[in-house]
Amino acid sequence: MLVAADQLDTRLYGPPVRPNLPPGFGTRYTWKTSKSTADRSRRSIYIHAKRNLPYPLLRVFDQPDMHESCARRPQTTIAPQALVLLNSELVLDLSRGVVKRIQDATYSKNIPARVRHAWLTVLGREPQKDELAGGIQFLAEQSTRSEAKDEVTRANDALLDLCHVLINTNEFLYID
């Protein structure tokens, strides 16, 4: 997701990253959030590890138990994973990063070009004819659902929804 949003910080080494924790974690065992957005764009291997407070996003996606060694990690596909990807503010922010890349690369009124660029950016391939048609139709329908007053904002809201959907596809999440 960080690569698709063009936000991955590839620096090696350095201090651990302390991402935002969801509300409701209290204050006793939490950590002070990293201030730099660049720090929050580093690989998950740099996320601060606290045995009694695993990072919730990683926990949902099979983070190993930090109390004992594990020779092999299980792979699961469970409903909370899909819910996190659909509802996480982090995933939505990364979708906004993808939208910015598309806006920087395409003319806003060229809808087919925006759909093609979304597919290339998120999935790494051109959309097939039916996918292109579906993407164009999706943008048209979503822009009418937006509560924004001006046409450009409605179009950008629809593009954000498309990018969010593409990030949630099996093709993006799983390597064949």
Model region roles, listed by residue range:
Residues 2-122, 126, 166-176:
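An acidic, gly/pro-interrupted, aromatic-rich
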Residues 80, 136, 156-157:
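Generic N-terminal initiation segments characterized by hydrophobic and/or small/turn-forming residues
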Residues 133, 150, 157, 166, ...:
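Basic, alpha-helical terminal appendages of large translation-related enzymes
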Residues 133-144:
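Amphipathic alpha-helical segments that form the core helices of the histone-fold
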Residues 145-152:
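Short helix/loop segment immediately N-terminal to the Walker
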Residues 162:
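Globin-like tetrapyrrole-binding proteins
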